[in-house]
Amino acid sequence: MHRREQSFGIQMLSVQPDTKPKGCAGCNRKIKDRYLLKALDKYWHEDCLKCACCDCRLGEVGSTLYTKANLILCRRDYLRLFGVTGNCAACSKLIPAFEMVMRAKENVYHLDCFACQLCNQRFCVGDKFFLKNNMILCQTDYEEGLMKEGYSAQVR
């Protein structure tokens, strides 16, 4: 049977002094701290709710945890282990699922690879780029090619 991954919220709760201490799902000891975490319908010490891979404290990293294959994971490790990867359209190397990317039509690029494929000029926010035969071109190289060949591309 195929189990789907799930993400769950993490709540930080203040412990009221007059309430009976709750048991921690991580260490099975009573939680006597000022704050506790609630996740997966269980209560946790702040130090006990950790990513199974990197040991980061999930209450500090964000408000979401991920579970799959009986593991409790932070977002980065969840994506690293179970996320979909692809290849960069410029360098053909693998792009990890957790890495930031740039997209142009159906092409996906590493941030460092998102540059004119003729002159290697990196693009800044707001710069125009053109697609010609799945190549990214800066405006200068596109216009030079247009003058030489009379081709057209799609402006992005």
From Swiss-Prot:
Domain LIM zinc-binding: 22-84, 86-148
Name of the encoding gene: lmo3
PROSITE patterns: LIM_DOMAIN_1 (PS00478), LIM_DOMAIN_2 (PS50023)
GO molecular function, one term: transcription coactivator activity
Name of this chain's protein: LIM domain only protein 3
GO cellular component, one term: nucleus
Originating species: Xenopus laevis
Pfam families cross-referenced by the UniProt entry: LIM (PF00412)
Keywords assigned by UniProt, alphabetized: LIM domain, Metal-binding, Repeat, Zinc
One biological process term in Gene Ontology: positive regulation of transcription by RNA polymerase II
Top-rank taxon: Eukaryota
SMART domains tied to this protein: LIM
